[in-house]
Amino acid sequence: MTSCDDKTESNYGRDDDEPVFMAMGQNNPKLAIALEQAGETLPDFIDAFRAGRHSEYPFVVKACFLGEDEEDRVHIWVLLNQLHEGDLVCSPIQIPEGFSGLQEDQLFILRQEQVEDWMINVDGLIYGGYSLRLAREMTSDAEKPEFDEHIGLRDFTDQNP
């Protein structure tokens, strides 16, 4: 498993039969702002994990992963299992069909600078999730209820976790 070093676009975009989530171009200026916000607040996320706050809820991070072919890349959410010397020990939550870069039950290490976004979903109140906020903003009003249900969203919060 190799993580992407640049902010290139995923080859796993939005399919016609999957209206809820869409591929966002990595050159989108709003996405750049969202990723910057996530990076600036990542220490709060890590502090919450270390302190055991919200420990009954999954702590997840988003990163870019390369497949066997370096042209094969995907930006996905993975579960934070533990911290090791400042790095994040993670495992996949869902692997896109056909993606060869990750295996179920695989553990891997992400450096903090590889994290694109982070999230804690506490009974529908989402801490972080800056790329999700943008994805929801880009979703039509008709699709927002489905989007919210899919991610279990009640509201976003800007409070520290």
Residue ranges of predicted features:
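Mixed-charge, low-complexity intrinsically disordered regions
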Residues: 1-161
